[in-house]
Amino acid sequence: MEGDSAGGSAKKGRDKEYQAILPLRGKVLNTWEVDQNLLFGNKEIHDISVSIGVDPHKIGEKPDISNLRYGKICIMADADVDGSHIEVLLLTLFYKHFSYLMETGHIYISMPPLFKVSVPNKGKKKERRIYCLNEEELKKTVEKLKKEKFTDAQIVISRFKGLGEMDWEELKETSLDPETRRLLPVKVGLPGDDLTGKAMQILMGNKEADGVNSGLSATVISSNPIFN
């Protein structure tokens, strides 16, 4: 996950029996054009590989993943442009160098909310916290609450600037608890279909993702049906 501060809250909110947190500092390396033999020269990538228990491999290979330590590998980043860029860089790493984990359905993107809506007790209903992924969800939530006769003064809206702003209970509820979190499974095209590879080459080749097109790269990949 992105950030040391958020990592501390996540470690407190996780289920220690089966969940582990690996905080990453800043943006990881764009590995699209990095030789596989040089990957472990990067500390973050080395730590990722060791943590999940799988060695890097080439697209199309079917390595032994019997030592895979976790059934779900979830990418957690802030719900902003920088966070989307980090997601793209990690997706690039997993697609190019750990592709079998994508093929077998082990890679997910965590979808933290942008907004929290709080309302007080009303009748038999206790006070509530409602999390909204985006402005569209926020609008629908506010409209629904007004139909329940909540006033503008009773509807308190907070915006999260990042994962680090959430306390451990909020992070647990929105991103860690299997009953309440939202995850987007990452899937790739059918074997032999090189459409995904061509798209990745356009977006990540020649260090494009490190320049002004990073926001575009994040948007295109997150909306590409190959990855959804």
Task: Locate the predicted segments by residue.
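Conserved phosphate-chemistry cores used by DNA topoisomerases
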Residues: 1-228
